[in-house]
Swiss-Prot record:
InterPro entries named in the record: GCL_type2/YbdK_subfam, GCS2, Gln_synth/guanido_kin_cat_dom, YbdK
Catalytic activity: L-cysteine + L-glutamate + ATP = gamma-L-glutamyl-L-cysteine + ADP + phosphate + H(+)
The name this protein goes by in its record: Putative glutamate--cysteine ligase 2
Cross-referenced PANTHER family: GLUTAMATE--CYSTEINE LIGASE 2-RELATED
HAMAP family per UniProt: Glu_cys_ligase_2
Gene3D superfamilies assigned to the protein according to its UniProt record, in alphabetical order: 3.30.590.20
């Protein structure tokens, strides 16, 4: 399959995708309820989409094309409320979070679709281990070349996105010590990591064709990059976030990405360069391991500061962009979170410490999602 033509989209529109956990109300383990929930929701009126994912123990909700933070918040809230109402008759719980705290990957099944069965055959047990839950945000780009500029410019802020959304401290019943352990599962795939440093669509097309000719990839879906262009939508897709525990936080983070994109496209505070990636993996690891307390190394100035402080350092520059986009509330929420440094991973650990039961932690995560 050749690379699709980069579709025209309205610049700075955005869309949000959230992968959610489906658990039974008996022991709060993951359970394959997606087909039942989708049947229960058939005919329900809502914007956006609700659809199955790689495992029937997870489900994805996504907005339509959004112009404002408030629009995304309303669309996701409606879908959340419909799903929570439908789940009651199924004795089903729905939760955010990047990983389920104690599920065993060997117990998972793969959804019966050609794409997911292909992934299972190709990647073996990695497909079942990929029962992790992420937030993806699409940002509309004014042109194909601008999409690559934005992809690499916003890459500096990947540690922000990871740390703000981090909600996966537990894997198979064990506290990993990470704020976001989910990204370690993604890293096992061969086409993960960062996109190649290319700033023109012609150069990117040539790269894609070389990769396709090797037989390693067939389409853009085979790249599991942290940020990837989506030519069929005319967007870039930011893919590093855990699914937060609430719709509110998911929308705050999406709006933060949108306002950063506006700042980068209009103000051009720097030009992306290959050397930006010298500290990319280190900064990303720090965000995964320590969350907002992680260390951020500036790729040009070589200064060091906590990720939370780096977020706070950019907030003032984002005020006019947040105001223009109608997302000052979201910026205030992001600023407050960075000041407190108490994200979803910290909340999960505190609940688990108080309850001394991961089942109770999942139950409370379900309540938090529904609230």
């Amino acid at each position: 399959m050749s690379l699709e033509t980069f579709k025209h989209s309205e610049a700075l529109t955005f869309g949000v995708e959230l992968e959610l956990q489906l658990v039974n109300r008996h022991d709060y383990d993951l359970a394959p309820f997606a087909p039942d929930l989708l049947r229960a929701l058939k005919g329900a009126e809502h914007a956006g989409d609700i659809k199955p994912e790689i495992s029937p123990s997870m489900i994805e909700i996504s907005t339509g094309i959004c112009h404002t933070y408030q629009q995304a918040l309303e669309e996701l809230t409606v879908m959340r409320d419909l799903m929570v109402a439908a789940s009651r008759s199924l004795n089903l719980g729905i939760a955010g979070g990047g990983t389920h705290p104690f599920q065993q990957w060997a117990d998972r099944t793969i959804s019966d679709s050609p794409r997911y069965q292909y992934i299972s055959e190709l990647y073996g047990y990695l497909a079942k281990q990929f029962t992790v839950f992420g937030q993806h945000v699409h940002i509309g780009c004014p042109s194909a070349d601008e999409s690559l500029f934005l992809l690499h410019a916003i890459g500096r802020y990947v540690p922000h996105f990871v740390a703000l959304a981090a909600s996966s401290p537990y894997v198979q019943g064990v506290d990993t010590g990470f704020a976001s352990a989910r990204l370690n599962s993604v890293a096992a795939f061969p086409m993960s990591g960062r996109a190649p440093f290319l700033l023109t669509w012609d150069a990117f097309t040539a790269y894609f064709e070389k990769m396709r000719n090797t037989g390693v990839i067939e389409s853009m879906k085979d790249f599991y990059w942290d940020i990837r262009p989506k030519p069929e939508f005319g967007t870039i897709e930011v893919r590093v976030m855990d699914t937060p525990l609430t719709v509110q936080r998911a929308c705050d983070i999406a709006a933060y990405i949108q306002m950063l994109a506006r700042y980068l496209l209009l103000s051009r505070p720097f030009m992306p360069q290959e050397d930006d990636y010298l500290v990319y993996t280190f900064n990303r690891f720090q965000a995964c391991r320590f969350g907002l307390e992680g260390e951020y190394v500036h790729p040009n100035e070589l200064t060091r500061m906590p990720i939370a402080d780096h977020i706070l350092s950019i907030c003032d520059a984002l005020v006019p962009h947040a105001e223009a986009l109608g997302s000052l509330e979201a910026l205030a929420n992001i600023r407050a979170l960075a000041e407190r440094r108490d994200g979803d991973a910290e909340w999960l650990r505190q609940v688990d410490a108080d309850a001394r039961s991961q089942r109770e932690t999942v139950r409370k995560a379900c309540d938090r999602w529904a609230a």
